[in-house]
Structure formats: C-alpha cells, structure tokens
Amino acid sequence: MARNEPSSQQPSSSGSNGTPAQQNGSAKPSKVTVKVVNASFTKAADCYVEITSDTSSAAPKKTTVKKKTMAPEWNEHLNVHANESSTISFRLLQKAKLFDDTCLGMAKLKLSSLTRNENGEFKNDINNISLLAKDSSKIGTLNIIFSGYPERKRRSAGVRAETAASASSEASTSNGVATSSSARRPATAKRDTLAAPTSTAAAAAAATAGGTPAAGAEEQLPDGWEMRFDQYGRKYYVDHTTKSTTWERPSTQPLPQGWEMRRDPRGRVYYVDHNTRTTTWQRPTADMLEAHEQWQSGRDQAMLQWEQRFLLQQNNFSADDPLGPLPEGWEKRQDPNTSRMYFVNHVNRTTQWEDPRTQGFRGSDQPLPDGWEMRFTEQGVPFFIDHQSKTTTYNDPRTGKPVGPLGVVGVQMAMEKSFRWKIAQFRYLCLSNSVPNHVKITVSRNNVFEDSFQEIMRKNAVDLRRRLYIQFRGEEGLDYGGVAREWFFLLSHEVLNPMYCLFMYAGNNNYSLQINPASFVNPDHLKYFEYIGRFIAMALFHGKFIYSGFTMPFYKKMLNKKIVLKDIEQVDSEIYNSLMWIKDNNIDECDMELYFVADYELLGELKTYELKEGGTEIAVTEENKLEYIELLVEWRFNRGVEQQTKAFFTGFNSVFPLEWMQYFDERELELLLCGMQDVDVDDWQRNTVYRHYAPQSKQVTWFWQWVRSLDQEKRARLLQFVTGTCRVPVGGFSELMGSTGPQLFCIERVGKENWLPRSHTCFNRLDLPPYRSYDQLVEKLSMAIEMTEGFGNE
C-alpha cells in the first residue's frame, strides 16, 4: 500500500514557532535545562536527585551525591529531552554501598503547567516541589529552575487536546480527511457526560499517516450507554435501558461462544459460561479466554509433572537398568512387613540390605592392587594403605566404596546414614505415633484455601495424625489416597501463592519461597502461618508432596541449623558478592563508612536496624568485619519474620515435634517434602554449555558417563548441588533460571586436579577441575556432593 503524504496546505497551530508537526501529532523533543538548586527533608542521608522525562528514552540524569545532610545544595544544571506535554519525574535517592539505592521521595511535574501562559517559554523562577513517599506522605521539598524553549506540539485532527487552553474550533486535515466540529470530542477539563462519537469521520481522522489509530482512541459505546465522571473524576458508565451503572466499559463485541449475560436479583450483571458451568462478574474477551487456556494448560502440565514425583526409586531391574542384572546366584526380595527391599545370596545362603552391584561385595574376594594393604583400627574398622603414595583411606580400592563396621540395624554405619535409612527411621516414628481411625476433611474446590483453614484449625492437632479422608463437595466417593494427593497439590498451590502476601519469591529469578516480612498487612497472618505449619507437618507425616518448596536457609531454620554466609548466595547474590568482597579485602585501606546498622525498605518506608547495641556509632573495621558479616547474614534471614516463623513452628510442632526431622539435612528435607522426579539426562546434556572445555573433552565425557550411572536419588542430589533445587523446570533443562534470568547449566574448567568441584547455584555452574582419570572424577564429585556445603570447598 502506497504511503500517504501529508498535505502541503496543512495549517500550523498557534505558537508553534513555525516548526512543522509530525504526522502523529506529537512534537519532537528538544533539550530543556533543569537547574537542581537544593532540597530539604527530615533525615540526614547520602542523597542525590535523579531526573527522567516520559518523552525520552535516554538514561536518567543524576546529580552528585551529597554526604550526610538534611539540606543538600547542588546548583547543578542537567539537560533533559522534553516537549511542552512532557512530564518530568524527580526522585530523591539515598546512596547505599551494599544494597540498592533507596527512594526517599519523588515528584512529577507537567511542563504544560509552566509554559501555558508564557507562550511556550519558562519564567526562570524557582519552582518549589513537594517530595512524596510511597504512602503519599510529604517528606520534604525540592527547589528547581527550568530554562530553555520546549518544542510545542501540533495537534492532529481527532486527537484530544490535553488542556482546556488547547481547544480550537478550527477544522484540520490529516491524511486528506476533513473533520467537522461535531465529530470532535469536547476539550473541557471536567464534564458530567461525554457523548460517544456519532460519525465515522472522527475515527478516520484519528488515524495516523501509517494507518494506525491514534493513541487513546476508544471503542464506540453501545446504544443506550453513556460515560460519566463522578466527583473524584473517575469514569463510570450508565445503561439507560436498564437504568443501571457500572465501572466496566461496555463492549459492542459479541460474547464468546457458550457465554451468556444475566442479572442477579440486585440488578448486577454477571456472565455464565455454559461450557464449564461457571459464572464470573468480569465480561469475557477473546484475550482473557486465551490467557485462561494458557494458564490452565500450564497448570495441567505442572500437575502432571507433580504426579510423576517420587521419594525413593523403585529397584525394578529392567533390561535398560544402568547397573545391569544381579550377579549369578543373587535374588531381590521385599520384606512383607516393612516393604523394604533386601537381597538374597543363594550361593552362601545369606541376606543383606545392600545391592551387591553397588556395595562391592563381589570385589571383596578379589586380591588388592599392587602396593595396597588392608589393616584394622583398634575398634575393628578396616582401612587401606597405599604404600606407593603413602596415603590411607576407608574406601576399598577394589570397589571404591567404604567398608565399615555394622551398625545397630545390622548394616554398615555408612549405609545407616543413607537417605533410605533416614526415611525408614522417620517413617517408623510416624507409624508408631499414628492415631487409629481416620479424620475427615471436606472442602470445596472453589474455596480450598479457606475451607481447609477452617477444617484444619478447628481440629485437635493430634487428630491430624489419623488416616486422611479428603472429600470435595459435590464429588462423593472413597479416598484411597488419590484424592488426598490432589488436595495436597491444590492446597499447597494456594497457601504458598505470593498473591496472599504470606510468602514471597526469594528473587526475581528464584522461585523458591520465603516468608514475606510485610505479611502483617493481613491482620490474621499469624493464624495463617500456624495453619500452614500444620499443613506442612501433615504433608511430611503422611508422606505427601507439596507443589513448591522453600529456600534452603528456611529448611536449615526448620532443622535448627546455623545460617552462614554461603546461604545468602541463593537468595541475594548482590549482597553475597558485596560481603565476600569485604571478607576477602582489607577494608581499612578504603573508607567505606560502614557501621553496624542495616537500612531496608518496608512498604515504602525506610527503616534502620542496629545489628548490635549502639551499632550506629560502631564502625566496621578489618578487625571486626567477620562479626559484622555474621550479624548481617543472621539479620537478612530474620528481619521482620520472627513472629511469622514462630507461628509456623508452633503449628508444625502441634502435629509432631521438629526433632523427628533431625535425621535429615536441608537438601534431604527438600526431597522429603517436594519429592524428586525422573531426570532426563539426554535433555540435561543437550542444554549444557561449556567454558574452557569442549563437549568432546575427556572430563566432560566422564562426567556424563558418571551421571548416567547414578540412580535418581543421587541425580537429584547432584541437581541440588549445582542448581540449588531438586526440581527440574516444567519445560525441562532449557528453562533453567539463574540470578540474571534464563541460564543454562554450565561446566567450566577451573582449578587443579587435587581440588574438589565447586558449584555456583546462582549461575547453574559447575567448576570441574581437569581430573586425570574417571575414578578420580567420580571420587571428587561424590565427596563434594555428600560431604560439603556445595560452594568454595577446596
């Protein structure tokens, strides 16, 4: 389609100084000089002013930082791109060293209010602007002076003027289509009614030269409808046919197929979806239905993935089992009382809990390699000596597995500490402390959060140990476990939803959950946290999984473990990097002006917390910086959530004591609560990038060979080690998220062959040293995963 050229006879608006208008009716921004004179506010701070224009995409302009003052003076000139209709935003920010800069107050100013009566020029007077906090309270003032001559805007036909003074009775031409005065909207600032356009010429005139409708063009109101403004300037709509009003703009578009509009006894409009037999107050649109379908599809996919989670992998030795078949003369059986798997050796007529393919019992009859010797400690524990390297180890060199004494349950002590053994002990505690009969919980699918709250909180907490009998209203039937599993999924999806303001995501790209310090906006939040504590305890006691999990530091709190600096990496990488810099450098050589205080923002209000008594007067030095780091880390995970955490633990302990969980570490607790899923190694390998390695490097080949040899439990532990969570995203490994957004798993060559591997969970990165053999790689990786915190251990 040929482009339409503007008419050469197009008139220019008054006061435009002869500058031709653009076809879309907007003015080309020109430079305006803003002199920031001074400011005054109620609290001394290191502050600066940031200026932006809504008609410019340039970076914000900033003044210099003024130190520790309540009345900073700048007298600095800043140039911004703006026209007469621009809105200039001013932000007074407090400079921070470790955290993001905090906004103390802000203000907005329309240039049209300054140039309206001055023929487009500024009066060069001082403008006193009030600075408002996020709660709209005044915190101070800012004095500024404007100079320059902003470009004036030429009005196109059909585009509504922004001020009453810009209204004109002259007809104008755009794209060769003339508009009459009756087709234009009135330009008065306030009016009780606003008539809908009655001519198609107005719509045509509102089009730009490219054929795009003008900004702000609205759909024509249906017959019998009228738009009005209330006393606060808010739009509402009057239906003269039914003599009713509504805040929602009526549409001339027909309802989607299967929908019907009805009115309740009070005359309110609602909509019936005959497809799903549901109702809603909101008028359905094609976009809304499409978004709902996408949400439903995503939820169904998440539900499907959740149903595939498991806690312990079933040892069904299929043909494609990476461990291969059992040795000749061996058989796997199941204990009918505990359902625990054991192995029978028909050759010597013995039984054992260990899988002979992984525990090395076949290799124990083979001779030791040259230069090796086996000895025993005074307690009878075997160990091995390598006379060539003059080292000792508890690992049998023939199998690579530890050999140790028998524990209290007849298996090796190393095996006693395995995840399976811990689960068996925990399940024994739950079984021996269960209560006879069942407890019935009846809820509605449409109100599962509140219904479950009423059911759980009105029952005696000990009764929640009974066998669960879940029933959804209108869905009569027997619950043999499937309904309970669905209830745990649906309810966990609701109670952990950040929309309720009880929990919040750990970061922009970290969807693990932590308690929201601002949860007090809900007056009953402590009761809800007690309810959630009971619910989480029920999930663990009855062996059910929840939809989403918490941060690792929260699991450590549940286990009463000390939170350390490394734990902050997953939650806030910026603070972690800052504290690591302080830890690794001599801060006495640079004037950082750090004190034992922490500033933070809560619901728009800036607060200061003393890390120790008199912290505002205690400077951080090289001598006391470790104490500062320790106190800051502890404060970071406890700020504003002490009462919520206490309520959560109160609810949890009312079902069963947290001491029962002391068998597990924080990673195992996450597996116990959220379950694990089959890890697709092929998908993982396809979505991996390499640094200083190539996909064909022998270390990379060994790594994937080792991953394929692992069972699902150990793969989940490896996934926790490198990404911080045992769960694979719904879209697979291609959807892995890092601290800065989507970030694929990465293997990087770092260190020497005697180093342990390191993980960076914020970046989904594994630092893999250049090991010389497959056995060395397996030994180092296994040690790093099982015996370390996962970062920085060498």
Curated annotation (Swiss-Prot):
* Role description: E3 ubiquitin-protein ligase which accepts ubiquitin from an E2 ubiquitin-conjugating enzyme in the form of a thioester and then directly transfers the ubiquitin to targeted substrates. Ubiquitinates klf-1. Required for diet restriction-mediated lifespan extension, acting in concert with Kruppel-like factor klf-1 in the intestine to perhaps modulate genes involved in lipid metabolism.
Observed effect of gene inactivation: RNAi-mediated knockdown increases sensitivity to paraquat, and reduces lifespan at 25 degrees Celsius, but not at 20 degrees Celsius. Causes reduced ability of dietary restriction to extend lifespan. Abolishes lifespan extension completely on an eat-2 mutant background, independent of whether knockdown is ubiquitous, or targeted only to the intestine. Does not suppress extended lifespans of isp-1 or daf-2 mutants. Hypersensitive to bacterial pore-forming toxin.
Domain (WW) ranges: 219-252, 253-286, 324-358, 366-399
Q: Which organism is it from?
A: Caenorhabditis elegans
One Gene Ontology molecular-function label: ubiquitin protein ligase activity
The protein's UniProt keywords, in alphabetical order, are: Repeat, Transferase, Ubl conjugation pathway
The pathway it acts in is:
Protein modification; protein ubiquitination
Give EC number(s), comma-separated: 2.3.2.26
- What does the tissue specificity note say? Expressed in neurons localized in the head and tail of adults.
GO cellular component terms given for this protein: cytoplasm
Q: Which PANTHER family match?
A: E3 UBIQUITIN-PROTEIN LIGASE SU(DX), HECT DOMAIN UBIQUITIN-PROTEIN LIGASE
- What's the catalysed reaction? S-ubiquitinyl-[E2 ubiquitin-conjugating enzyme]-L-cysteine + [acceptor protein]-L-lysine = [E2 ubiquitin-conjugating enzyme]-L-cysteine + N(6)-ubiquitinyl-[acceptor protein]-L-lysine
Sequence ranges of Polar residues compositional bias: 17-27
Q: Which GO terms describe its biological process?
A: defense response to Gram-negative bacterium; defense response to Gram-positive bacterium; determination of adult lifespan; proteasome-mediated ubiquitin-dependent protein catabolic process; protein ubiquitination; regulation of protein catabolic process
Look up what happens after changing residue 762 to A: Abolishes ubiquitin ligation activity; prevents ubiquitination of Kruppel-like factor klf-1
Name of the gene encoding the protein in the UniProt record: wwp-1
> Where is there biased composition of kind Low complexity?
1-16, 161-186
What's the protein here called? E3 ubiquitin-protein ligase wwp-1
In which domain of life is the source organism classified?
Eukaryota
